[in-house]
């Protein structure tokens, strides 16, 4: 993005694509969506859910635990109405109010819940915690869970991990908006991330996408490593339907990525270039071409940052310190269209969501 900030020793190991953890096998186990961190310093973990509802509204929620300056536990909630109106809130919880299970996904923060077994999930947000916004939803998976190899991308002792527990599923239940509750249906997605070092020490940025084209679910990403970790890009592609997985590929030996359509108006000029069109091709001739058409969200992270007591008293100073360090992370989310071309040449049109995270 901008000039380099000191993120620790320069003696940092590069990513080695060939020798990444690959011992768990193809079958994802229920325990893998349970808590994977032990609260050691610099660890973090989150369980993420999003849904596109039949009325055109969008829901995003994430249950987060981080262990940087101190142990912190919070839920972020974003609701976009059918008219495009946006509501966002971040709520922090005390350690005595939270619970994390290791054997399966069972995360509780007061009366808020994220619980499931890779097939079915309950996700609940208490409207009392979120200014009369909330939901009580069920997510039922229609596609097998996915991770690239073991899901752990490691550079020396430092790592970032990702499990797409529900690549695509059916959503049902109720949602409360401004204190009024209604029943809803739609489609949804759930993934789980964890790691043991600040992300800026591993990546400059990433592009991530999920979408549906005909019967096919597509997930892809490209992680852009910082120079001290090799400075190269790490592509990932997954294509599946309800019956089988067609593509499960990771790394530059199997995937080629291309970008175009420079994003001109969303970021400071000193930031690294980011692009709203993204393509990926596998060595066995599957390809995905994405066009980011409509901006759903464009966030300067520090402007949205919410801090618990007592740190919120010093938020202006903390923000100024970060900005003075020339770090200006942005998060942009696009409603997207895409084309999926299968190995036999068949082409399917679809829609999805693409996100760009500029970490520095």
Predicted feature locations:
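Structured soluble/peripheral alpha/beta segments that form catalytic or ligand/cofactor-binding pockets
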Residues: 4-360
């Amino acid at each position: 993005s901008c000039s380099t900030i000191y993120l620790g020793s320069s003696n940092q190991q590069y990513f080695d694509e060939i020798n990444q953890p690959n011992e768990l096998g193809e079958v994802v186990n229920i325990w893998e969506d349970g808590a994977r961190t032990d609260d050691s310093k610099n660890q973090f973990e989150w369980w993420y859910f999003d849904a596109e509802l039949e009325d055109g509204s969008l829901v995003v929620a994430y249950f987060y635990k981080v262990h940087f300056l101190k142990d912190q536990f919070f839920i972020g909630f974003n609701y976009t109405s059918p008219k495009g109106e946006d509501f966002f809130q971040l709520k922090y919880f005390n350690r005595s109010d939270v619970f994390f299970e290791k054997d399966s996904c069972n995360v509780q923060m007061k009366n808020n819940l994220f619980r499931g077994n890779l097939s079915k999930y309950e996700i609940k947000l208490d409207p009392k915690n979120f200014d009369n916004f909330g939901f009580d939803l069920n997510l039922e998976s229609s596609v097998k869970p996915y991770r690239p190899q073991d899901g752990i991308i490691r550079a020396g002792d430092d790592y970032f991990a990702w499990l797409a527990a529900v690549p695509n599923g059916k959503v049902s239940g109720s949602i409360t908006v401004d204190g009024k509750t209604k029943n809803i249906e739609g489609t949804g997605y759930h993934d789980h991330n964890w790691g043991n070092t600040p992300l800026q020490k591993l990546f400059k940025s990433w592009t991530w996408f999920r979408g549906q084209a005909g019967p096919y679910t597509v997930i892809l990403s490209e992680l852009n490593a910082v120079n001290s970790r090799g400075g190269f890009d790490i592509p990932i592609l997954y294509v599946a339907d309800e019956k089988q997985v067609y593509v499960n590929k990771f790394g530059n030996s199997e995937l080629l990525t291309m970008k175009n359509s420079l994003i001109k108006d969303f970021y400071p000029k000193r930031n690294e270039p980011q692009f709203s069109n993204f393509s990926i091709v596998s060595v066995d001739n599957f390809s995905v071409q994405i066009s980011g058409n409509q901006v759903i969200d464009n966030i300067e992270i520090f402007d949205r940052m919410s801090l618990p007591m007592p740190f919120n008293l010093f938020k202006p100073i903390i923000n100024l310190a970060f900005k003075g360090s020339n770090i200006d992370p942005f998060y942009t989310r696009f409603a997207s269209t895409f084309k999926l071309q299968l190995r036999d040449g068949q082409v399917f049109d679809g829609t999805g969501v693409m996100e760009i995270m500029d970490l520095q």
